[in-house]
Curated annotation (Swiss-Prot):
Coiled-coil regions listed in the entry: none
Source species taxonomy: Eukaryota, Metazoa, Ecdysozoa, Arthropoda, Chelicerata
UniProt protein name: Large ribosomal subunit protein uL22
GO biological process: cytoplasmic translation
PANTHER family in UniProt: 60S RIBOSOMAL PROTEIN L17
Biased composition (Basic residues): 169-178
MF terms (GO), sorted A to Z: structural constituent of ribosome
Chain positions covered by the region annotation Disordered: 157-185
């Protein structure tokens, strides 16, 4: 079992999944992972399916050199975006694996949220391409490691209404003394 970069706050209410040396572009996968961070599991799976179908876009914020501008990116408050199909498929499979782990642990799958997702660079894989005049250039790939931690969302407790438990207004010592005098009279 591999080591994770963070440990969940509540290990009994969370589950993990990871993939190592995945042959998918690091930069595209990092942007896709940032897009689904802190999403509910069901929403993230739906989002990734929409990315594969080009119905929703992945905003490119860090690795955005040469990335074209798209109208769909306005929903995320930026202008540049793409639909990295392979990255979305790899992340979707990883989320499915984490969902199976949660189901095995007996967690409520509908209340799961992506608490932590991280994409790291893996060692580059080397190939070669043949150029003019007998030269050879490197033809590298940039694989990545992905880890995800899902946690059960806490139940939201309704706040008490203001009529039931209204906080008393603070009074100055002078005003309290005046009220005591009035009560004595």
């Amino acid at each position: 079992m591999g080591r994770y970069s963070v440990e969940p706050d509540n290990a009994t209410k969370s589950c993990k999944a990871r993939g190592s040396n995945l042959r998918v572009h690091f930069k595209n996968t990092r942007e896709t992972a940032q897009a689904i961070k802190h999403m509910a599991l069901r929403r993230a799976q739906r989002y990734l399916k929409n990315v594969i179908a080009k119905k929703e876009i992945v905003p490119f914020r860090r690795f955005n050199g040469g990335v074209g501008r798209k109208a769909q990116a306005k929903a995320f408050g930026c202008t540049q975006g793409r639909w990295p199909k392979k990255s979305a498929e790899f992340l979707w499979q990883l989320l499915r694996n984490a969902e199976s782990n949660a189901d095995y642990k007996g967690l409520d799958v509908d209340r799961l949220v992506i608490d932590h997702i991280q994409v790291n660079r893996a060692p580059k894989m080397r190939r070669r391409t043949y150029r003019a005049h007998g030269r050879i250039n490197p033809y590298m790939s940039s694989p990545c490691h992905i880890e995800v931690i899902l946690s059960e969302k806490e139940q939201v407790v309704a706040a008490p209404s203001p009529e039931e438990d209204a906080p008393k207004k603070k009074q100055s010592k002078k005003k309290m003394a005046r009220q005591k005098l009035m009560q004595r009279d």
